[in-house]
A protein has these predicted regions:
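Domain-level signature for soluble enzymes in the chorismate/prephenate branch of the shikimate pathway
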Residues: 1-284
């Protein structure tokens, strides 16, 4: 079995793929879109991509591709504790530029302002790419914000540990595929969820309220709602909602009511949620 992930080695996504599929062959891709397209081209059996961070919010590249272009769905979710490290080729040298993924830069911004107020920040496709770039340029006064695994992967030193702005920092990762995967027995499911994209009719007054009411009066709990541009005209949106899948039969009736209201529904995923332990504590 082949599993694709947002690479390179040492990225958070690589660690999630390793925890979830410890015995499978894993293939790194440069961008989230590349990972999903690899699945669509039948190069891999499952794709592992980030979908939401508890601090920075949704990963729009993932959600927008799945809504606008993708036919693939989420078949499992893994929640991973995020710890960011400041990595260098040699400790205690001046740092002029810090490289990382945009969300990692945002998570480490407060630390950088406090300890390196004049440092420049440059974006990369992933935290691990930043670590690899720093390792490949040992003569430059640069650093990377990346996971601890990237330090050992690329031979870097930890200049500062756990620099994330908020300690309670987690990222949801989706495993995309055609069927429910055989997740490692070291991970246990904690709940079941469904993710939907709703497109509202323009001629239905109170369309969003009526759409959400189909779940509310059936006692189906929402855990998230978010709007994204339809990319058709200014002010036109679709809505992403996450639901607890505790009553599948009721959910089917809700789908029927949405259809009767003229609300288009696209299932982005139906999946079990797994957690990776952080210092012995399971986190959702």
């Amino acid at each position: 079995m082949l599993v694709g992930y947002l690479g390179p080695k040492g990225s958070f996504t690589h660690d999630v793929a390793t925890h979830s599929f410890p015995t499978s062959e894993r293939i790194a891709y440069r961008t989230i879109t590349d990972v999903i397209k690899a699945y669509e081209n039948q190069e891999i059996d499952f794709a592992v991509v980030p979908v939401e961070n508890s601090i920075e919010g949704s990963v729009h590249e993932t959600l927008d591709y799945l809504f606008h272009q993708g036919t693939i769905q989420a078949v499992a979710e893994v929640v991973y504790p995020i710890k960011q490290q400041l990595l260098v080729t040699k400790k205690d040298r001046p740092i002029r530029t810090v490289y990382s993924h945009p969300q990692a830069l945002a998570q480490g911004k407060a630390f950088l302002r406090a300890h390196y107020p004049d440092v420049a920040m440059e974006m990369t496709a992933s935290t691990a790419y930043a670590a690899r770039y720093v390792a490949e340029h040992p003569d430059l006064e640069i650093a990377a914000i990346a996971p601890l695994a990237a330090a050992s992967e690329y031979g870097l030193e930890v200049q500062a540990k756990d620099i994330q702005e908020i300690e309670d920092n987690y990222t949801r990762f989706w495993i995309l595929g055609a069927k429910e995967p055989a997740i490692s027995e070291t991970l246990s499911p904690v709940l079941q969820k469904v993710s939907l994209a709703l497109t509202l009719p323009s001629n239905l007054a109170g369309a969003l309220y009526k759409g959400l009411s189909t779940f509310a009066w059936r006692g189906i709990n929402l855990t998230k709602i978010e709007s994204r541009p339809l990319k058709t005209a200014l002010g036109e949106y679709f809505f992403i909602i996450d639901l607890l899948n505790e009553a599948p039969d009721l959910l089917q009736f809700a789908y029927q009511e949405l259809d009767s209201l003229g609300i288009q529904t696209k299932v982005l995923g139906q999946y079990q949620v797994y957690t990776i332990k952080d210092n012995g504590m399971e986190k959702r």
